[in-house]
């Protein structure tokens, strides 16, 4: 029976015109640390109606509506009721060939943002063009045909055959392209949202669909001009959730169907069996026409409330305008990357249907669930700049995740990647230094201690340094123990049978690995810091001693004095002389001596024959024979030097030259840790520029980057799965951390770092959450300002400055400052008094 129709004028007054309130975006405590059984299983049911669900901590308060958090459903929204009833709203787009695009939308993303990580506002554009043929592909083929002397005869023949085919396909796709703009804003207490879909081309058909997100029990129906649905709670079977979708105008057609397949058949011109599994509204739009709607989830049936289109638009406009006002944002050549990072990580925020919270998807086309390898550790550090709530949920999710099949059964970071434990330890520690939150430390610490204590099984000769695990004879996978796949460092190690160990079936090898031992030391150092915070002094002493032992051994055995590099070495004493950015990893782990760090930076990092240049850093040194050895190289080609043929890899793939965000982030942190402020700023500026080049050009944040400007890895790539890869944001976060950061290294973990000696121009970043305060920074050639909670607390004039160990007290502040010339500094403490002094160029400790 149809519900009573509420007059349009009452709609927004009932559901709330404001964006999502703080009560809805906070972390619920649920029932303390109680774990919920995987949703959708028998274990997820149990509580009776009226009982509080056994939600895990941390998670989102129920009920909630979140746009775009079901994997790759960028145009849709997930609705979750109090008892964990679940509903999916999707916006589908029909292609000219009659194919319905309704989920797994990564290939069809056209424009991203603006958006927020809490779902208060989200905007995307999707298109029927999957960009498998792009102008760069066609240009590359023309280049091959025009210069047959530079390519093999078979490559020229392949290009000659494919160019007309791909040109025809491209022209057809462009002529038939349909693009829509989708906007959402959460309303009221966060259980509802309003949305709008705008056709950017004529003859556009879109579908508004209500269904179950993961095939769970639910029923749907038509009700007047709208759609309704109901579903039992997965945590509380006796509690039923209800959803209503209310459009502002009648659809051209509508129906309820027995399955998604039936619905798809019906909206694409066929017939579909009626039923209650899915309901859909179909609209046929001309260019510029917009459909608006509202949707809400509740514990009881919802009255039909039809919104006014102009009220929906007003709410969307207000929420969109608030994106920069209440979330990470910035300006300037580097600072503007803050908005891109916010949008990218908001896009890749996903809901874990088993552990009932949000996390950051690592990549693989935006899907694949939670990944507990090293990738997601970078995602946690980056997400912490965007949203404390998201970062804490993400890293908690990692440490509650079971081991992948056929692996050592450790909960948390996966053991087949020996750097996943160290990197997640570093990520968890940075959540503590950023927010002062011990909850994730307490959860992570036992698993990380176990991970650390298993690592000696990779010490083949029992000398205290680790050797590379054997990962098989496939060249492309021999570096998989560190996620380095085909890195040439690992091409020639030898297998040695392992005795005993954790149950990991891999054997040992004869290669003492600089990178692996740097991670080993990082884990020991981080565990020592965690142990001090958690009141475990004996553990702190043990792990600090372990870090010192690795530092001594690595400097004794893996420093090549003639080359001035930390290099891996075989057990027979011969050196592995392949030079990659892992030579800098001892700086990241605090192992390098100050003099050796200076040699690494001045003689190697800044050498354009090795690593320096407009693009940094290649995954193999440019003067190493292994550089770009993964395929043919065409030196005379201006823009397609590394292009081979359509659909195939290129010379820098994968770790044979391409620039990788985790490598850059590791090198940057090491350089910054050792106090090379000028170099760190220049490095961060280059990393950020590479990220922004891809973002500005295609709205992508790719898995890896070209090692040289204007080349073809990403522009000519066909595989769209790597275009929205979360760790890409680590490139831009270097620039943002250069402006303001926590202090993850020595000294007071509550202290701040801010300012820069060498980022270009004047840059700002705002709405950065650190230790319970909201910060903004402006840093330019002759003025640096730090604002806390809306009040200026630091100002330096006359020079560029980089500030470390900044601690603001009620009656003053203390900090270390590095200035590129004489400057005046002022501190405005909590007592309201201004305190200032002059500082010379160089380094000065200041107490005011």
Give, region by region, the residue ranges found by the protein language model.
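Extended glycan-interaction surfaces of carbohydrate-active proteins
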Residues: 328-368, 393-412, 464-512, 552-659, ...
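C-terminal capping/lid segments that line or modulate ligand- or cofactor-binding pockets
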Residues: 49-86, 424-427, 431-434, 560-604, ...
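Aromatic-rich carbohydrate-recognition surfaces in CAZymes
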Residues: 369-492, 514-517, 576-577, 657-674, ...
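N-terminal export signals
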Residues: 2-4, 10-30
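Terminal accessory carbohydrate-recognition/targeting modules of carbohydrate-active enzymes
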Residues: 2, 40-330, 721-726, 741-848
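Extended, well-ordered alpha-helical scaffold segments
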Residues: 307-311, 315, 333-341, 387-399, ...
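C-terminal region of N-terminal signal peptides and the immediate post-cleavage residues
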Residues: 25-47
